[in-house]
Design a protein with these regions (language model features):
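Conserved short "hinge" loops at termini or chain/domain junctions
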Residues: 1-53, 104-131
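Mature extracytoplasmic domains of secretory-pathway proteins
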Residues: 47, 51-55, 60-69
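Short loop/turn elements at secondary-structure junctions
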Residues: 61-131
């Protein structure tokens, strides 16, 4: 279910522990994403098939606001390791440690952009005609 607790759990899985001071911002982000999706699909609720996308979008909105207004709070996020290669079949995972020219802030920005944009094409499959 897409709610504030699901977004909290997603943030924990990313290495950020939401505190009591984050409650208002989390509520705002969840409602913003819920409203955005409902307006795009012309529906009353976020469909079950879009919940994982909504959770990531809300987490991305929250991390973006933290990065903008309280960047010191994001010290718990580990941005040193990024998966460089994943091979299906004989499992082969290679980490891109020290590779690339991106700073940790640029990697955070790229990750936030991914969270905000991932799955937007899937939203279209849930659209209804507006009369």
């Amino acid at each position: 279910m897409f709610d504030i607790e699901a977004v909290r759990n997603r943030l924990r899985s990313l290495g950020y522990e939401p505190g009591e001071n984050d409650e208002a911002a989390l509520n705002f982000c969840v409602e913003k994403v819920r409203s955005t999706i409902r307006n795009k699909i012309n529906g009353k609720n976020v469909p079950e098939g879009l919940e994982h996308i909504a959770i990531d979008m809300a987490a991305g909105e929250f991390l973006l606001s933290k990065k903008t207004f309280a960047p010191a709070d994001l010290k718990g996020l580990d941005l040193d390791y990024a998966v460089k290669q994943i091979q299906t079949g004989d499992t082969n995972t290679v980490f891109a440690t020290g590779e690339g020219s991106q700073t940790p802030e640029q990697r955070l920005t790229s990750f936030i952009n991914y969270l905000l944009s991932y799955g937007k094409a899937e939203i279209n499959s849930f659209r209804r005609i507006r009369w």
